[in-house]
Regions:
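Electrostatic, structured charged patches in enzyme active sites and in nucleic-acid/phosphate-binding
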Residues: 1-105, 113-118, 137-330
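Flexible coil/turn residues that form the inter-helical turn or adjacent wing/linker of helix-turn-helix
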Residues: 108
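Short amphipathic alpha-helical interaction segments
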Residues: 121-142
Length: 330
């Protein structure tokens, strides 16, 4: 659910209409094509769900460690702290604390239990020690937000000071945008889930030999897109719809139902051996999505995910509306 996305106010759309002028045989053939397509989609979802169940097992048990887990282990092995000078302040930080700052900064807000899982390989004790040190130095702030079931979730955000310190640390690529504080508290849990979704997708990319080099949230995508649109729309001689199509293509996006579709998150990654940069646009759909909105995201080419408890409902909608898209479980 991209921030600012309003579900359509018109009636839910209907699936592809049958051509009444076609022969019964053609309609039967089209019906079988739809059935086979949905069977392929369901098969892919079942295989993905099975991989998820296997991946949730502990490393060192029935599966080898993931590349991310191996990198984290190397970071955790370095326990000494280094002095970092920022103007008139000196911070004492070890690599795992810098890594935690980057994780929180890239996603604005991160659940504490998710940070332990993905940035500390489940070592909650080490994470709590790091958070205490970061908090004492005024670099992070702990906040409690409500999840979709209205249960409290402990989260972390960067403070302005933490954001500035991270910017000066040179621990990130210069083009990687970072954030501090809660911009829209009502949407905070959605951002929390994007952090987990990011690691799910990036683990899959790395499992196929790729390397994620940058992540862009919809905040950044919208900022760049709208700035480009505003600049070009100053030329009144150009057709607005033509401009919209051209700008969307320039940003690797599509216009569907006369609107530029914006994903929740874009991962940029490189594949060996060419190291050419590829992108993957992902959308975290919720139970509030109407079929028309879900269809627009699918037609835009986004990889669609949903919480485990909501994926089944969205898949039923997909089947009823004959949408040609896989819905993965988060």
């Amino acid at each position: 659910m991209s921030r600012g996305f309003d579900g359509p106010e018109i009636d839910d759309f209907h699936g592809p209409e049958r051509d009444v002028n076609r022969s019964p045989e053609s309609n039967r053939r089209a019906g079988w094509d739809t059935v086979r397509r949905l069977e392929r989609i369901r098969g892919e979802e079942e295989r993905a769900d099975q991989r998820d169940r296997e991946a949730r097992g502990p490393a060192g048990g029935n599966r080898p460690p993931l590349p991310r887990e191996e990198r984290v282990q190397l970071v955790l092995a370095r326990t000494s702290r280094t002095n970092y000078v920022d103007r008139n302040r000196t911070y004492q930080l070890r690599d795992s604390e810098l890594h935690a700052l980057t994780e929180v900064g890239k996603f604005r807000v991160v659940a504490v239990h998710d940070l332990a899982q993905f940035a500390y390989n489940g070592d909650s004790s080490r994470m709590q020690n790091d958070i205490a040190n970061l908090s004492r130095q005024g670099l992070v702030k702990q906040t409690s937000i409500m999840d979709s079931d209205l249960s409290p979730v402990r989260t972390l955000t960067l403070t302005k000071e933490g954001h500035r310190a991270l910017s000066y640390s040179r621990f990130l690529r210069p083009d990687q945008v970072t954030y501090h504080g809660l911009k829209k508290p009502k949407e905070a849990f959605h951002d929390v889930e994007l952090y987990r979704l990011y690691h799910k997708v990036s683990d899959e990319i790395e499992g196929r030999g790729g390397k994620v080099v940058r992540v862009k949230l919809d905040y950044e995508i919208k900022r760049d897109l709208y700035a480009d649109l505003a600049r070009i729309w100053q030329d009144k001689s150009k057709c607005p719809e033509t401009v919209k199509e051209a700008v969307a293509r320039r940003h690797g996006l599509k216009v569907v139902n006369k609107e530029i579709q914006i994903p929740d998150m874009r991962l940029e990654y490189a594949n060996d051996p060419d190291m050419e940069i590829h992108t993957r646009d992902v959308e975290l759909a919720t139970e509030h999505y109407r079929p028309r909105g879900l269809a627009a995201k699918a037609r835009a080419g986004f990889q669609i995910y949903a919480r485990r408890g909501e994926a089944d409902r969205l898949r039923r909608i997909r089947d009823q509306r004959e949408l040609n898209t896989v819905i993965f479980s988060l």
